[in-house]
C-alpha cells in the first residue's frame, strides 16, 4: 500500500521524508519543507553524522517567509550559504550600515535602502565584484530575507535590497 511505502521511506531516508530537494540543482535554495516540518529538518541537520558530511564552510538557513510560489504560505525554502570568512561570520555585518530605510522600489514593492560607511562601501564593492553571477544572501537574525544574484560591482556604498519584506 501507499502508506506502507511512505513509512518505509521515512525509515530509510528520514530527511527526504520532510525536505524536498530543489530539483533544479542550481541557485542558493537547496530544498523545501512544509513549515510544520522545519523543526524536524533542523534536528536532522544538527546531527553529528549529517554535519560531518557537509562542507565546514556551509551554513543552512531558512527563508524568513514562505516561498513566493506557495500561495498558502506553508512551504519554506532552505538556503545553502557559503561562509567566506575564516571566523564563520558574514563578510559584512550591521556595524558598517550608517542608514537603512524602508522604501518602495520602482515596481512599488517593499525594499530596504541602505548606506554604508567608507569601510563597508569598500568591502561591499569587493564582495560584489568577486561574486558577479552568484547570489549574495541577505541574512537578518538568522533568516534569509533575500538572495539576489549580483549583476555587477556595486560602488558608492548605497544599495537597495528587495526580497521578502513587508511594508
Task: For each feature predicted by the language model, list its residue ranges.
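Non-transmembrane, solvent-exposed regions of membrane trafficking/translocation machinery
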Residues: 1-150, 154-155, 159
Amino acid at each position: 500500500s501507499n502508506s506502507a511505502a511512505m513509512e518505509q521511506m521515512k525509515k530509510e531516508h528520514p530527511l527526504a521524508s520532510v525536505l524536498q530537494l530543489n530539483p533544479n540543482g542550481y541557485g542558493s535554495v537547496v530544498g523545501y519543507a512544509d513549515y510544520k516540518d522545519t523543526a524536524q529538518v533542523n534536528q536532522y541537520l544538527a546531527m553529528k553524522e549529517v554535519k560531518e558530511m557537509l562542507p565546514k564552510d556551509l551554513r543552512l538557513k531558512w527563508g524568513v517567509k514562505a516561498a513566493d510560489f506557495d500561495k498558502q504560505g506553508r512551504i519554506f525554502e532552505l538556503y545553502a550559504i557559503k561562509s567566506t570568512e575564516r571566523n564563520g561570520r558574514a563578510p559584512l555585518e550591521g556595524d558598517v550600515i550608517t542608514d537603512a530605510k524602508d522604501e518602495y522600489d520602482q515596481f512599488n514593492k517593499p525594499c530596504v535602502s541602505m548606506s554604508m560607511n567608507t569601510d563597508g562601501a569598500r568591502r561591499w564593492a569587493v564582495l560584489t565584484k568577486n561574486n558577479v553571477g552568484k547570489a549574495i544572501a541577505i541574512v537578518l537574525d538568522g533568516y534569509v530575507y533575500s538572495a539576489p544574484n549580483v549583476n555587477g560591482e556595486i560602488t558608492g556604498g548605497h544599495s537597495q535590497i528587495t526580497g521578502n519584506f513587508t511594508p
